[in-house]
Amino acid sequence: MQLYHRYLKLPFNFEKPTLYDSVELKDYCEFIYFKDEDLLTEPILNFIDSIGLYRIQTNSVYSAPKDGIRIHSDTPDLSDKVKLSFSWGSPDSKTIWWEPIDRRKVKVVDFYESHMTRTVKCSKIKMATIPERIRLFLKGKKIGPLTKYAWAKEKDCERVLARTIDRPSLYNVGRLHSTWNPSNEGRWTLTFILGKKRNKKPLEFIESLNYFSDFIIKE
């Protein structure tokens, strides 16, 4: 049994937030944070609450045409944290999951900007290395809030699963994964980090299979 992804058939439809259409689109992938009330996510939050869960955080990601996000996990360690995901746009954009051949090759890095492209636009990655901190200090610039991610090089990983994320999904973000959008159309993804109401701990993928058992599409 694979523990990376499941498609869902939910008891409601949720259209792409109109707020996304007001965003100036870039030629690279970008993480953007919006308030739930501005995204009108109440139907999703009510559903999450009805099955004994709660939203820890809401994230929005824009996947630019012919661009992708390098191999990473959404956590500073390799785990099985799960997100509930909704996507709109390119039907060809894929998420690929990887397992490290040698865990010692997995690095934890501080990012102060979330442009983690893995293509020719990789220069947009902003890692908070010591030389970079010194460069910013000398320029009189403050380093923004830091986010820790685990990441690895493709040559140090084994590809284990690829899925087109074109419908509601459960998505293991604690394992290494990357994205690639080969089309000429962008893609928006709205994700929710989930927690269990009974103990306030983050939901793990294998646990999510029980909470969402009535809504998982069998493959």
What is the meaning of each model-derived region?
Residues M1-Y62, G68-I69:
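Non-heme Fe(II)/2-oxoglutarate
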Residues S63-P168:
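Catalytic core of non-heme Fe(II) oxygenases with the double-stranded beta-helix
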Residues R70-D74, Y171-S183, T191:
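Short beta-strand His + acidic residue motifs that chelate non-heme Fe in jelly-roll/DSBH
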